[in-house]
A protein has these predicted regions:
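Generic N-terminal amphipathic, Lys/Arg-enriched alpha-helix
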Residues: 1-13
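A polyanion-binding, active-site-adjacent surface
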Residues: 3, 15-160, 168-170, 175, ...
Length: 220
């Protein structure tokens, strides 16, 4: 199957594209886009991979689902398009960056600038029906994104994996802590941010680790 995804990822994920689950997933997603409103727009489904080639990945942040409101989702977890008000979790992420690094709250919630520096902003599920949170879960996306994380963790070294909340922590449970830095805390959602997200210093800790391993820090 010829999947429109960045070439280095295409090579590493090629076996997945031929598996039954992925063929069924593709048929389901194609049908959904033809019959109802799906986010993100189709050209952005694999944008997290397209902006962040396999060998350029320094950091992985794992999300769960794309935003399901109009104009929000554009294929990067937690990120929104320019001009879109910050969802609560993203607002809290920026507050923690401000507290941790002294950086001002940005004017845009578009995290493409992170992706361009090597931050893979990966949702576990890459599509969703408008206004129906979780509507494309358990259709095969989770298996596909598990494979992407597993291949990265096995074939690369010294990546920072950031796991916020129990869902992301379960998804990243197999990552070898001897080869990579795994940072885990509560989710930035208002429901849990005060239970361990605020004050986690994940952004400064990420940069310290990258610099200790000869890499350029991220401009958060």
């Amino acid at each position: 199957m010829n999947v429109q995804i960045e070439e280095s990822w295409k090579q590493h994920l090629a076996p997945e594209f031929e598996k039954d689950y992925f063929i069924k997933l593709t048929e389901f997603v194609r049908s959904e886009y033809q019959t109802t409103t799906i986010y993100p727009p189709g050209r952005f489904i694999f944008i997290a991979f397209n902006l962040c080639p396999f060998d350029k990945v320094k950091v992985v942040i794992i999300g769960q689902d794309p935003y399901h409101g109009p104009g929000q989702a554009h294929g990067l977890c937690f990120s929104v398009n320019d001009g879109v008000p910050f969802p609560p979790s993203l607002q809290n992420i920026f507050k923690e960056i401000q507290s941790d690094l002294g950086a001002p709250i940005p004017t845009s919630g578009n995290l493409t600038r992170w992706a361009n520096q090597g931050v893979l902003l990966l949702n576990a599920t890459l599509t969703v029906r408008a206004h129906q949170a979780g509507s494309h879960q358990r259709r095969g996306w989770e298996e596909f994104t598990d494979a992407a994380i597993r291949i990265l963790a096995e074939q690369r070294e010294n990546i920072v994996f950031i796991l916020w909340g129990s869902y992301a922590q379960k998804k990243g449970a197999f990552i070898d802590r001897n080869k990579h830095l795994v940072l885990a805390s509560a989710h930035p959602s208002p429901l849990s941010a005060y239970n361990g997200f605020f004050g986690n210093k994940h952004f400064s800790r990420t940069n310290e680790y990258l610099q200790a391993h000869g890499q350029t820090p991220i401009e958060w």
